[in-house]
Amino acid sequence: MSSPSHVADTPITDRRQLVEVLASGEKPAQQWRIGTEHEKFGFRLDELRPPTFEGPQGIEALLTGLTRFGWEPVREDGRTIALLRDGASVTLEPAGQLELSGAALETIHQTCVETGTHLGEVAEVAGELRLGFLGMGFQPKWTRADMPWMPKGRYKIMRSYMPKVGQLGLDMMTRTCTVQVNLDYATEADMVKKFRVSLALQPIATALFADSPFTEGQPNGYLSYRSHIWTDTDADRTGMLDFVFEDGFGYERYVDYLLDVPMYFSYRDGIYHDASGQSFRDFMQGRLPVLPGALPTLRDWSDHMTTAFPEVRLKKYLEMRGADAGPWARLCALPAFWVGLLYDDAALDAAWDLVKDFSLAERHALRDGVPKHALKLPFRGGTVRDLAARAVEISIAGLKRRARRNADGQDESGFLDVLREIVDSGLTPAERKLALFHGRWNGSVDPVFAEFAY
């Protein structure tokens, strides 16, 4: 979840400006970059509870501790709520899940080092505060009521609005963690092709990375409960975006979609004005009830773009949003998977060949089925595991052709070894944890905090 943007306060007088924001993301291939984001759950080592914001063991104390590594604090109402350094940021999700939004980097080698460096810094400070951090898709032990709330104006508005539009939106906010990657496009046509491929294959990523099988200490019947949660959060701003596959799709059609997504807020002069459920189209006419007469700025539009949560999201780049969070190796594998598919022309063509004849019903069956069944979901006489094997194969070939090597001469394809192992075994991370729960853990989720912490 993004923090308020800092785009120019240019007033919006014409819909064309909104289209130009998306078009301004176009970059030649040599300028394509990789932006990886991941979230993680904090817990107190003594009782495994999530830390509150305040206090000697609190999230603010952790953020303050991280400033020793050169991070610059960002404050809201006098409280440190985020950190900035060299194009990267550390921010807070609603219940204090700690998010690293990485800088725009050139290779997976760089993004994996960036993630590892961050995890090391967090571990050092967290250890002093007797905190730990866990990478999974859903909080395995604590109830919604057990989760603290961070003091951010945006989240206060969303917290009151979510229960009006879905049963599980508050769980999405407080009890989920994801890993995602942001990738570039060269032209509108390139964006469309990448958008279609990544939407169709997003359920494959959900299956491969499935790691949220527990709710409140018990198996919940899902392998990616985090993915299921998005199906009952807010239908106006989530889903598989069928219109992306329609003839004529492009920037204009996506702008129309965003204009139909109800607003959450307008951020003016350091204040979040609650505009939940109101229309950005009305805002453009100066008819926003909460700010009568005011016209939106490009900052308002940039903020509004972050309040849509489809499986793949377009801003000035494409965001892959389907995967559960996990350990360091999978935080490197997720961007590698998508870079291999989308940043090599032959791989992108092969991926499109794989999915181009999927029907709308099939795309929805994949999206709706993988949260529960993951790789074992039946599909066209085989299973999702077969699709995943092919997608991983295409991605590995794409990374080999990309041939971005580290100092030891290795290309980026090695980052997919962890996915190859999941495909070969047919076992998702969630299924491995369920086996431990029913075996060595003796029906307790508590060992997950020791055995799978960063």
What does each of the following model-derived ranges do?
Residues 28, 107-110, 114, 182-186, ...:
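Conserved aromatic-histidine-acidic binding/catalytic patches
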Residues 41, 180-184, 319-321:
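Structured core elements
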Residues 1-167, 175, 210, 330, ...:
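Terminal catalytic/cofactor-binding subdomain
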